[in-house]
């Protein structure tokens, strides 16, 4: 511990100070970094309470060395947690200063003025009561708390608190005090370093003072008193700062949750848009087969009519090639009588072979009929011009056939029904005598 007050070294419990009633482990915990060393001095021996004797692992100095104890003990320790991030100890025993303040203290051995005032306020002393260097004897904190039982044997300085003299109306110093009293202090500032030891029962309100000059001389007199309010407590400020820090952390967590929820919402919106597009594609694909089924009967009807036309041409060709006398009345069909196409017409069969004596004359006719049938079976739209077939009489047989066929135009894209006229057929056959 830098001084006997356990104020500066900040290690160990409340019993590590002079007269704190520390245990065997607490007596040496403040020296160094927590381990025993050859230069560690037993604090219990300095207070005349060490009962370990030769078994003590700390050094028991001679009385001549007591005057130089301040060289190694009268030091202030800075709080490194406060310098790094934040100190969470409400009753921190170390000095809350910056790294530059600590470096300046190690070089010069003196605290900056603002830190001296802060440390003195924590101890209930004036800044002048603090030791100015490492050569001075440390202050006895047990005496400041009223617990020092050593009396005149105590090797540390006994300083009186300022509020004791202020309550008595005296402004001087006493009891070994080497400084002046700060004006305007009515009561002791709350010692944040002694919170577990003192509690809240030791505080006494300041004296009341009658306020004069507020009432007229002839009127009723009312006595009013002015109460002095205590300055803000260090502990309360620390609690408020901790609460603010917790609230800030909570706000940061809520902000993170909001950002996560926004990202999840964007992903869900994208998935919803994808599902809507998939539904549209499924609807279009289900409509396409229905259109194909609607167009199928039309194609079948056209094919049926093509077969009917082919059958008509085949019938005409077979009738024209029969060598029998036929009158013109039998060959003329009623005008405007439509020929009903067969529903399930079989593909046209090949025409029967002509007689041997008509083969040279019938060959051009068969080729023309085959070409006409091929044109009738072509895919729609189909347009057929009137076909006129004439057979010149080479032999004694003369065959003349004219078959005017009206133009037929079929389109399955406009209407499923196909209407076509069939004109009258005329055929003149002259039979030659043998």
From Swiss-Prot:
Protein keywords: Coiled coil, Metal-binding, Methylation, Nucleus, Repeat, RNA-binding, Zinc, Zinc-finger
The region annotated as signal peptide is none
Q: Which residues form a coiled coil?
A: 234-280
Q: Does the keyword Transferase apply?
A: no
Q: Where is the composition biased (Basic and acidic residues)?
A: 196-207
Q: Which stretches of sequence are listed as region Disordered?
A: 1-37, 196-217, 314-362
Q: What is its main location?
A: nucleus
Q: Name one GO biological process term.
A: regulation of RNA splicing
Q: Compositional bias (Gly residues) spans?
A: 12-35
In the record, Omega-N-methylarginine modifications are located at: 185-186
Report the GO terms under cellular component: nucleus
Membrane-spanning regions, if any?
Answer: none
Q: Which domain of life is it from?
A: Eukaryota
Please list the residue ranges that the record marks as compositionally biased, kind Pro residues.
Answer: 339-358
Polar residues: compositionally biased ranges: 314-330
User: Subcellular localization, per the record?
Assistant: Nucleus
The job of this chain, per UniProt, is described as: Specific regulator of miRNA biogenesis. Binds, via the C3H1-type zinc finger domains, to the binding motif 5'-GCAGCGC-3' on microRNA pri-MIR143 and negatively regulates the processing to mature microRNA.
Q: What is this protein called?
A: Zinc finger CCCH domain-containing protein 10
